[in-house]
Amino acid sequence: MIRVRKLLVCTFAICLTQVALAQSDVERGRAEFLSSCAVCHGAEATGDGPLRPFLVKAPPDLTMLARRNGGEFPARRVMDMIDGRAAVQIGSHGTREMPVWGKVYAEGAGADDGRAKLHPEWTVRERITRLTQYLARLQVP
């Protein structure tokens, strides 16, 4: 009985840790959004950022991505759009107004920790994944 109780306590502790980690990832995604995206998309991701009047094409309302995609959040497409490296050959924007964040993140990798210097793509993927997870939570039903 004591072994079962210990096992249950350990399992519960692991679950709480995972919830805390997931929450911190969402908060990091939110911080990433506010520092990188809100200037165009707005703090609430509705496309009303302070730079909107100066852009040729208005930024989309990112809270409506799932609704515009038949009710399913298009995570892969969002990640590819944020990354941008597959679609752009030259410069930080290429032919689009949105920055190529994959390139920006790759160039900045290693500034925070040694692991990122060894594997900058990990940092790029983590940042884009956190940002995508945050956007998924903002979706209007």
Predicted regions and their residues:
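Bacterial N-terminal signal peptides that target proteins for export
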Residues: M1-T11
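Extracytoplasmic/secreted proteins, especially bacterial periplasmic and envelope-associated proteins
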Residues: R28, E32, D61, F73, ...
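Axial heme c-ligation environment in periplasmic c-type cytochrome domains
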Residues: P53, P59-P60, G84-V124
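Periplasmic/extracellular electron-transfer cofactor-ligation site
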Residues: S24-D25, R30-K57, R68-E72, D83-E97, ...
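N-terminal signal peptide c-region/cleavage motif recognized by signal peptidases
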Residues: T17-V19
